[in-house]
């Protein structure tokens, strides 16, 4: 039976529980996050995104390096009904503007003040963008929320409301957008990936000996 990315994530978290899902190097020491905590963080962040205004079908751009924040926000945006799209951290402000506008992003996650500066430089070209989430750093620019400030919005949304968003997802719904790099300009292409297509890719990867999921 076809499932969604979030259904498979929930099943994996329930099955793996206290086993490590993610590892992050902090002050030279690898710290593990269990599947149970990973699930809890994703659901809390999904509620926070809903509270901050992410609506079903909204684009959610990520301009950040690979990290626990990235994968948490990525899955949280899907759970909240959004459609995530990753940007290359080497993108110019103009390339960022192209992708953020093209994917109809109402929110964008940036992991540093350097990446934030790129978005702010083209902010007037992005009328659909409502919120910029800053993982590391501080800013008093309008519409910028730190990661900690974002999490407080979770209090405005119940678990039942989040579950309703998750239950509304269908296997053939759009799950994510993947943009190619533009060698000298904007992205040369965009791949629309449905939930069932994303899971098919996961299964193909796992069958080749590379377990993307337990």
Sequence positions of predicted segments:
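Structural core segment of the AMP-binding/adenylate-forming
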Residues: 9, 51-52, 79-152
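Conserved AMP-binding/adenylate-forming core of the ANL superfamily
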Residues: 22-75, 92-97, 146-154, 194
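Helix N-cap/beta->alpha junction signal
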Residues: 64-66, 112, 173
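Conserved S/T- and glycine-rich ATP-binding loop of Class I adenylate-forming
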Residues: 60, 77, 108, 174, ...
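Conserved pre-ATP/AMP-binding loop-to-beta segment of ANL
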Residues: 17-20, 134, 139, 151, ...
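AMP-dependent adenylate-forming
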Residues: 8-33, 135-142
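Conserved structural elements of the adenylate-forming
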Residues: 39-44, 171, 190-211
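Conserved AMP-binding A3 loop
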Residues: 32-36, 175-199
């Amino acid at each position: 039976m076809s499932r969604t990315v979030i259904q498979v994530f929930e099943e994996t978290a329930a099955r793996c529980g206290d086993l490590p899902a993610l590892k992050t190097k902090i002050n030279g020491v690898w710290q593990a996050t269990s599947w149970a905590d990973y699930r809890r963080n994703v659901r809390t962040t999904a509620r926070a995104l809903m509270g901050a205004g992410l609506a079903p079908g909204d684009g959610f751009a990520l301009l950040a390096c690979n990290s626990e924040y990235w994968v948490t926000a990525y899955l949280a945006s899907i759970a909240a009904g959004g459609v995530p799209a990753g940007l290359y951290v080497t993108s110019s402000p103009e390339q960022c503007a192209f992708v953020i506008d093209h994917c109809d992003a109402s929110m964008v996650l940036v992991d540093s003040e350097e990446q934030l500066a790129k978005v702010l430089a083209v902010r007037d070209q992005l009328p659909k963008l409502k919120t910029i989430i800053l993982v590391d750093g501080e800013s008093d620019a309008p519409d910028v929320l730190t990661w900690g400030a974002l999490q407080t919005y979770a209090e405005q949304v119940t678990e039942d409301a989040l579950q309703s968003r998750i239950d509304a997802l269908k296997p053939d719904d759009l799950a994510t957008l993947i943009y190619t790099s533009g060698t000298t300009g904007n992205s040369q292409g965009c791949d629309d990936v449905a939930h069932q297509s994303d899971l098919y890719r996961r299964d193909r990867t796992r069958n080749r000996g590379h377990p993307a999921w337990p």
